[in-house]
Amino acid sequence: KKVVNKLKLRASVGRTGNDKTGQERFLYRPTFTTNAGGFTQGIGDTGGTNGIGNGIVEGRFAAPYLAWEIEDKQNYGFDLGLFDNRIDIIFDYFRSERRDILLQRRTVPQLGGLRQDPWQNFGKVRNQGIDMSMNLNQQIGKLKLSARGTFTFTRNKILEYDELPQKYGYQAVTGTRVSENTLYIADRLYTEDDFIVSTNANGLKTYKLRSELPRPTLGGLIGPGDIKYVDVNGDGVIDSYDRVRGVGNPSTPEIIYGFGLNAEYKGFYASIFFQGAGNTSVLLGGATSEGWYPFSWGVDQSNYRTFALDRWTENNPSQDVIIPRLHKNNANN
């Protein structure tokens, strides 16, 4: 029997445009607002101010140069059938580059006199990856068996982004992946050895951070069990300059995979399917969360209760915990 019974090669190159950017249709037209703050023309005859209604000011600046976003795409792949299609393989490599992305400029100085940041076709993102699937089929008498596996990997890179030059290159968005996080890097949890400990008459302890350690400026009272962050720029202070772009993985998974099994016998059919994601990171509580607490949604239906049990305490001063020392309010650390 022939080993290869099907082979199909595919290649495509194209260009597409996108005008559905989630904004209004007439972004290129200027707007004016009539509810601007009122103004006066001096003092009236009775001694009061001589007020004259609200003014008219320009809102959005005209942008007749706006155009569609452009995306250049390439795709190369093959379909392969083996052993009378008992094994069927589909593989694709794709690459695209999206440019002239419609966005509001972030680096226009206020001296320009614009009340709103102007819109412009600016920005470029490259995306590439592979997509593949494999099907296995076998019949034993009246029993039909099949299995299917899928795998997708994609990675993007921001080639052009409207940002001011950063003091430290590790904070720049350009050159990183879309939806990556800018975060502090946790070194470990503080221990009592990191502090000068004092105990008052009531037995309560106060902690003063040792001078040789980087000084946090994030707010709150620091103590054993709190997170000790990395002083990335080495200036002896933990502040916004120690936040690093690209810590962990993007919030959008780069890997999607799945596996399934099917069985059919005399009209009865059974199927199972598994699916997973990889190369992704999740922030507990969200990127802008001010902390979390039990019954945040009215009814505690999350894993937070389980996470909270695996936390640092004086009786469990472990570095291998999910949650650091708990506070009764937002401690900013």
Language model region names:
Residues A62, G77, R243, I256-G258:
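Short, hydrophobic/aromatic alpha-helical segments in well-folded domains
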Residues G55-E58, V237-D242, K328-N332:
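Short glycine/proline-rich turn/loop motifs
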Residues D131, W297, N303-R305:
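Membrane-proximal N-terminal amphipathic helix
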Residues P250-G285:
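Glycine-rich, aromatic-lined ligand/substrate-binding cores of catalytic
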Residues F94-R99, V108-Q110, G276-T280, A287-G291:
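Active/binding-pocket-proximal capping segment
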Residues K1-I185, N332-N333:
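Extracellular/periplasmic, surface-exposed regions of secreted and cell-surface proteins
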